[in-house]
Amino acid sequence: MSDWQTVRTWLAGTYSNRAQAMAEPVWFIPVTLWYVEVAGLFGEGAGFFTEQVSEHTPNQPYRSRVLQLLDNPLRLENYRLKDQKVWAGAAKDPERLGRLRADDCEQLPGCTLYLERRGETFTGKMQPGGGCRLFPGDASYVEIEFELGERLFFTLDRGFEATTGEQTWGSRAGAYRYLKQLH
């Protein structure tokens, strides 16, 4: 199987960091994270809808995004949804998610995650330099790095103030360690 196909297969699923949150409740809340492949979303590669929810507020999904998995180089392009509210909760609603189209999304320049195989996992990182901004004119930038395995997804998402470099949001205690839920 090609690296592209392996990432596609491994990424799709439902993840939870409950074990981490129970072991380190001061630093982590229990979160469920979905990566749902959306057939035919883009003209090339594979499209994924991703969303997360705190297990304390299971009916309030947040951080909905769309990713496009591409090859040569192996990478994930990040997209924001033009109308977050319309798609909130769609990770658990296949019928609604089936209506998602590329024109419902807006690419986030500078937010590409470049993937590299490292033994039995893949690592993903953005180009350094603070180029990933969620909205034009943002005074802060985002940095994301992750490790993906067949049954794990460790991710460190952080926001920084552009002029000072001070971290403004995200984990200060390391990556969220998600394990794939087998149903």
Curated annotation (Swiss-Prot):
Domain of life: Bacteria
UniProt name for this protein: Chromophore lyase CpcT/CpeT 4
A GO term for molecular function: lyase activity
Family: Belongs to the CpcT/CpeT biliprotein lyase family.
Keyword Lyase: yes
InterPro entries cross-referenced by the UniProt entry: CpcT/CpeT, CpcT/CpeT_sf
Entry keyword Lyase: yes
UniProt EC number: 4.-.-.-
Described purpose of this protein according to its UniProt entry: Covalently attaches a chromophore to Cys residue(s) of phycobiliproteins.
Pfam family for this entry, one: CpeT
Name of encoding gene: cpcT4
Taxonomic source organism: Gloeobacter violaceus (strain ATCC 29082 / PCC 7421)
Keywords associated with the record: Lyase
